[in-house]
Every structure is written in structure tokens, then in C-alpha cells.
Amino acid sequence: ARGPKKHLKRINAPKSWMLNKLGGIWATRPSQGPHKLRESLPLSVLLKERLNYALNGRDVTLILNDKEGNVFVDQKVRRDKGYPTGLMDVVRIEKTDQSFRILYDTKGRFVLKSLSKEEAKYKLLKVTAKAIGPNQIPYIVTHDSRTIRFPNPEIKIGDTLKYDLVNNKIENFAHLESGNVCYIQQGNNIGRVGIIQHIEKHQGSFDICHVKDAKGNAFATRLGNIFVLGQGKKLYIELPSGDGVRETILEERKRKFSY
């Protein structure tokens, strides 16, 4: 077996896709792109399983291969049915005039948050690397593999940028520090939202971040799992229903049977 893998069995697909186990043998394997395989949602799954715009792969191909371009990810036309969309990406469907932001719910499943035309013009980026390139040009790399040259010198690794997709400019940024609202992007607490209480430094190991949600529930996670959502309590984006507060088993049961 030389070269890259080209197939993905449905039973081995990420749980976040919520695929029907009996819906066939295969799932669309995401192409190489800005997000990792297990942290992405390919366009074909998004169109078939989430938006119900297509019944099969042929329908997906017809939608994506529209002459003028029908599906835009971060303001760019995408025609590859395996293109990996991921956290904070803005997906626009031209024919239906709809825009969505890709987020996780509190159970770690991908959800699409509907956006207005103004909200669809920007996205949030987490800074993952910072360096100085050839000719002493400073640059930063973000979680969706963007390279931005000549950033504000105050921006550090772990900070969040509010990025204008139309003009390709950084509008604003928020530091990874106590008092800011954050979103958990990985781990057991994925999808939860809360305010950073304090950060424990552990030399040679993982730094731990303590967070408290809107209901006062406290939890801790690795610092690398934190995605800052804004400065203080002011959010740069709108959250999906539930506002990132995880229900207990009893609360969920009560909600389901309260009809």
C-alpha cells in the first residue's frame, strides 16, 4: 500500500459527522486541505447529511460543478466534493442565498449556525505559530493553515483574530488570558463555552486552563484546546442554540419529555 489512502469506511468515519451506520459501506474521505481528517467535514457530507440538498454523490457533483460556482468556503469557490471544511469556516450556498458557520455542539458534533450577510464576511482564526521568515518578514500561521505576513507585534500564539474575508485583513484580536470568553475545540469538554478563570503553567507538561460556564459549572482542559471567542464577555460571533452550556443527563431527559 504505497501512497496516500484514498478510501474511508463508513464505520471508521468521525462520530462528529453523525453518519447512519447502515447507509452503505463507504464514506467520503476528506481531501488534503486546511483541516485534519478527524477535525473536518467534507462538502459532500455537508450537502447530503446536513443540508439535505443532495440524495447521492451524483447530485453533489452537479451542485458543486455549477458554472458560476455554487458553494463558497471562506469566500472562495470550491468544487471538490471531499474539500475539508472545519471549525469556524464560513460556507455559502449561492443559489439558496444561505451562509453558515461550522461549529461543534456540546456533544462534539458538527452544527451549522445560520449567518446574516454581515456575519458571513468575517471568521475567527486561532494563531498556532509565529516566526520570522526570509528577509526578516514576520508572519503568523492560523488553525486553518493561513499564513499572514506583517501581523500586529502584540499578537501571540493562542490568540484569536477576527479576520475580514473580503479584504483579507485582521480587524481585531483577543488575547488568550483570564476573563475572556472561550470555546473548547477538542477533548472531553468539546463545544462548551465559558469564561477563563485562570491558567496553570506546568513546565515540561501540558498547561491547564480552568473555565466556568454561564450556569456556574467549572471544568478544566488543556490550554491547547482553548479557542478565545472575544475580548472580555463581548463575543465576536453568535453561538448555536444552548450557548455552549452542556446539559446534565437529567436536564436533557426533562427537556425531551416535557411535551
From Swiss-Prot:
PTM-bearing positions, type Phosphothreonine: 248
Coiled-coil parts of chain: none
Record GO biological process: translation
One cellular component term from this protein's GO annotations in UniProt: cytosolic small ribosomal subunit
Molecular function (Gene Ontology), one example: rRNA binding
InterPro entries the record matches: Rib_uL2_dom2 (IPR014722), Ribosomal_eS4 (IPR000876), Ribosomal_eS4_C (IPR032277), Ribosomal_eS4_central_region (IPR013845), Ribosomal_eS4_central_sf (IPR038237), Ribosomal_eS4_KOW (IPR041982), Ribosomal_eS4_N (IPR013843), Ribosomal_eS4_N_CS (IPR018199)
Record-listed Phosphoserine modification sites: 258
Record carries keyword Secreted: no
Domain S4 RNA-binding: 41-105
Keywords: Phosphoprotein, Ribonucleoprotein, Ribosomal protein, RNA-binding, rRNA-binding
UniProt record similarity statement: Belongs to the eukaryotic ribosomal protein eS4 family.
Protein's UniProt name: Small ribosomal subunit protein eS4
